[in-house]
């Protein structure tokens, strides 16, 4: 069963090259399971034990199941994750011709990818394209996935870059521009990409107004290791937590509390967008749920005091070759269960109270749990947990499954950890 779930995850990752595609795939899955889509512009009429979801910007989503109990007294049980991953974004008017022969695309870095992992790999291209419409305030938005190996970022030969293995510094503007094609007389000069998009979308190139396009690794993820105990794939951070949370939401029985799965966008660039964790998106939706159930704002505020959030973003496992980069005592590893993330700086929301909650959940689910802290002389990252807490004053724990090579084009985790994470999430939604 563990490998079945792992292969489901790999398929989801492959079919979700961008946040737009991840939300579309989650949306399709939820609708198949009987969840009803709500529009922010509509008035909501919700039913007890009803199943619903709402999207934002095509790249963020909140799904929920209304609980059996009084929402003011039972509150919300929330799992939060994010849909975006670090990489590159194509700039406007991106075509650059070199030596009157090569056509490459101008890019900017999105988030904090490990740049050298993107070299010499066949890359595909996906994202969202905005087309002209009759209403200027509402362009037609279409997602596109050019699932072909059309791009590559070639390395410079070692004969011309002798220091490449000695810590060569990669220039983000010069060194990371992907090669698209050779100059072709049949394509309109300077509009190679627009021509390609028009063909993919079966539209006129004049109708294309703008786009958000991201290169991604063409090769699909896989199970690997002597016993296929590992998962190797791009975008484990953080779509594996999206997959785990959505599956738990669908599988868990209806509880007294209202179960919520929130998938934010733009975590990798600070979350400060309308669809990110540093917005009122989640707070607004939670309040609307309470109001749509016939309660008032006082009941909403009461519900928050009875709520709990699991901020699910991946954790660093001890590296087999560089174990000294971790704390000398607290050392999470692959295959030994999900990880509670702790920081005195409050870059994670976990405290003794919230950590104990998740530990008891894991104990009830029969799941081993680990802990992570940074070395005291190394600064770590943060995630949506502390950002969301500034908008929603509810108890929260930061956790995630352990992986290696975080922010590489191809990350590396354990089959068992993902399975155990789903078990813990299902138990959380059940209680």
Language-model segments: which ranges?
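N-terminal hydrophobic/helix-forming segments and targeting peptides
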Residues: 1-431
